[in-house]
């Protein structure tokens, strides 16, 4: 049996919190809804049902570790159990970018929770890990060569991760191109942006009030902030998650966190097919595909098949490459490709004469106007230059997209 929970955690200088929601219970509570919840229910009804969904919230602060053992026990109960009939009782944790962030923070917490004398020291250490993960996220080499993070990665989590950020390829929602270097960098879609697409009833962001005297006195106890005014501290602490979370702000922060976890459940409710696909393929081919986009699923299946046919372990071949400094298109255009239209015949002959080099591969671009549509051909593929438009099917016309 698989127990499905959605999870999100938050880290501050003096606090870590975990919020869990029972995914199955969430789906049952809204089983009568199709599409966005706001298309079917009033806001009051949505909030009422959400209040009845099973959830668990834990937090540990620098002054309060009363929930520590309860939280550790909650994680320990997630460890898989193989029954006498061979079935496995396990927990699958759904999240958003949880494979890269939440899992690492959870590993750090479970590894180090009992290695410090005080919860204050633990919170400080977890904030250090948090800062490393965030500061190194755009530097993959540094991220994977950091000694502390590599130690933490070795901890085996008691649950199975389902990362919806990757399942729906939202980690590569678009590409930014550096105008000076031409370097292309993929960017992801935040959970807040996704909430708009889901037509979620509560577009919530966590924002702390300006630093007041009570919070300012906490900072001024440290030598580096001694003598600073509240105004100076407000200019210094721009990011809310870098601040000391005062007890009076814990409740609104947990409410914000819970809203994010409900959003994870809502993604699964509105778009279940991609998740079901990964469970069925994973079961059929004995692979973990629960954090894989479709393209990555193809890679994993191909590696598995090649490994089985060749007898080689995956590590022996997956990083092998054929290095080419030049590539003639004529060598990769199959001879059976022919066109009846002279315009396309001319384009085909032109393409056969093209040779690209490693240094100029991004400079190859061709445009062709064909039956009223402009097509752009580049080394990355072919794309149409379409005007933004919304097309809706009716009883008379059905719009079908082919790619």
Indicate residue ranges for each PLM-predicted region.
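Entry/capping segment at the start of metal-dependent catalytic domains
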Residues: 1-40
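Two-metal-ion RNase H-like nuclease active-site motif
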Residues: 2-10, 163, 399-403
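Residue-level signal for well-ordered alpha-helical scaffold segments within enzymatic catalytic domains
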Residues: 19, 104-109, 193, 197, ...
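Conserved DEDDh/DEDDy metal-dependent 3′-5′ exonuclease domain
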Residues: 33-193
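Conserved "right-hand" nucleotidyltransferase catalytic core of DNA-directed polymerases
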Residues: 179-186, 197-204, 211-402
């Amino acid at each position: 049996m698989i127990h499905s929970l959605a999870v999100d955690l938050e880290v501050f200088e003096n606090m870590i919190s975990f919020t869990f929601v029972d995914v199955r219970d969430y789906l049952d509570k809204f089983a009568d809804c199709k599409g966005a919840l706001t298309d079917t229910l009033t806001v009051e009804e949505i909030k009422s049902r959400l209040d009845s969904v099973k959830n668990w919230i834990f937090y540990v602060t620098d002054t309060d570790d009363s929930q520590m053992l309860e939280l550790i026990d909650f994680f320990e109960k997630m460890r898989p159990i193989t029954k006498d009939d061979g079935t496995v009782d396990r927990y699958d944790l759904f999240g958003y970018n949880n494979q890269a962030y939440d899992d690492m923070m959870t590993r750090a917490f479970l590894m180090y929770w009992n290695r410090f004398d005080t919860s204050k020291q633990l919170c400080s250490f977890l904030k250090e890990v948090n800062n490393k993960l965030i500061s190194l996220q755009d530097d993959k080499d540094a991220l994977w060569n950091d000694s502390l993070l590599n130690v933490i990665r070795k901890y085996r989590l008691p649950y199975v991760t389902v990362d919806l950020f990757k399942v729906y390829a939202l980690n590569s929602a678009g590409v930014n191109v550096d105008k000076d270097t031409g370097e292309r960098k993929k960017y992801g879609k935040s959970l807040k942006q996704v909430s708009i697409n889901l037509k979620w009833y509560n577009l919530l962001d966590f924002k702390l009030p300006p630093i007041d005297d009570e919070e300012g006195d906490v900072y001024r106890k440290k030598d580096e902030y001694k003598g600073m005014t509240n105004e100076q501290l407000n200019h210094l602490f721009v990011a809310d998650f870098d601040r000391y979370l005062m007890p009076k702000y814990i409740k609104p922060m947990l409410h914000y966190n819970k809203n994010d976890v409900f959003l994870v459940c809502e993604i699964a409710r509105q778009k279940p097919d991609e998740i079901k696909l990964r469970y069925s393929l994973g079961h059929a081919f004995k692979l973990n595909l629960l954090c894989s986009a479709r393209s990555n699923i193809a890679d994993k299946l191909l590696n598995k098949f090649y490994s089985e046919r060749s007898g080689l372990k995956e590590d022996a071949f997956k990083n092998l490459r054929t290095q080419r400094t030049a590539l003639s298109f004529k060598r990769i255009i199959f001879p059976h490709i022919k066109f009846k239209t002279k315009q396309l015949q001319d384009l085909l002959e032109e393409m056969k004469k093209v040779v690209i080099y490693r240094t100029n591969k991004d400079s190859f671009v061709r445009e062709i106007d064909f039956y009223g549509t402009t097509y752009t051909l580049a080394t990355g593929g072919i794309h149409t230059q379409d005007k933004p438009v919304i097309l809706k099917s009716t009883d008379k016309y059905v719009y079908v997209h082919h790619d």
